[in-house]
């Protein structure tokens, strides 16, 4: 039976069904348990990073090689014809589509991945981040990590802490978890960085429970997942940043009343919003989360490039 992800563009989380998300999570678990080095043998994947990336690019390229594919591409968009000779993104994509079986693309411009998908001649485009818009494969590894640690994706209490206004990871993960049953969200942020209205309106329309908070200490005892994010210094003046930052620092002491199954996640890099003493607690899972990016991306690539997987 053909899987619904075969040759599908992976541009945004809302375009993926619950069944597709579950298939990716299940396949990631299988590949973590039993590696398969020939899943995309003889397939060539373009890794096109028009802005700097460390974890995402290395994770994708590792995933491609571990399941038997070959990688071509670049990690510095400034040295491409697009930048140096004025070539349009659409022209670049049309040319590269002649060489490869799939695109992985990160670009600073919102909507760039969708534009690429319109000019790729049917070659599937996987969005590795387009500006502040979407980062769907981060969400896939987050879902896999939550499933791995909680043994479920339904019936969860999940808190997001920090920059909820600009953080594309929290927007995408909220949209993904909203497809599951009995999810209760806790959004913890200063008013200036609160979750955007469009996300809250979607939750209201779907009848999904959420609450807004400015203090995380009071919600920690209720949580299964605590998802921390960095408060971005560049968005505040010095005194305002110092005040906001100090309110959203997770320490080991704050976790003393947490549920035994609570896991702390973070898309990384962290600055000082999680103190290093948290690393030694059984709740810390952000480094394993980053490692899971390889398996989630292996699963996605395998499904996009195999008709009957």
Curated annotation (Swiss-Prot):
Residues annotated as binding L-aspartate: 85, 168, 230
Signal peptide region: none
InterPro entries linked: Asp/Orn_carbamoyltranf_P-bd (IPR006132), Asp/Orn_carbamoylTrfase (IPR006130), Asp/Orn_carbamoylTrfase_sf (IPR036901), Asp_carbamoyltransf (IPR002082), Asp_carbamoyltransf_Asp/Orn-bd (IPR006131)
GO molecular function: amino acid binding; aspartate carbamoyltransferase activity
Record key words, sorted: Pyrimidine biosynthesis, Transferase
Keyword Transferase (UniProt): yes
Record's catalysed reaction(s): carbamoyl phosphate + L-aspartate = N-carbamoyl-L-aspartate + phosphate + H(+)
UniProt-listed GO biological process terms: 'de novo' pyrimidine nucleobase biosynthetic process; 'de novo' UMP biosynthetic process; amino acid metabolic process
PROSITE patterns linked: CARBAMOYLTRANSFERASE
Gene Ontology CC annotations of this record: cytosol
Pathway: Pyrimidine metabolism; UMP biosynthesis via de novo pathway; (S)-dihydroorotate from bicarbonate: step 2/3
Pfam families (UniProt xref): OTCace, OTCace_N
Uppermost EC category: transferase
Record family assignment: Belongs to the aspartate/ornithine carbamoyltransferase superfamily. ATCase family.
Subunit structure comment from the entry: Heterododecamer (2C3:3R2) of six catalytic PyrB chains organized as two trimers (C3), and six regulatory PyrI chains organized as three dimers (R2).
Protein function: Catalyzes the condensation of carbamoyl phosphate and aspartate to form carbamoyl aspartate and inorganic phosphate, the committed step in the de novo pyrimidine nucleotide biosynthesis pathway.
Protein name: Aspartate carbamoyltransferase catalytic subunit
Source organism: Vibrio vulnificus (strain YJ016)
Name of the gene this protein is made from: pyrB
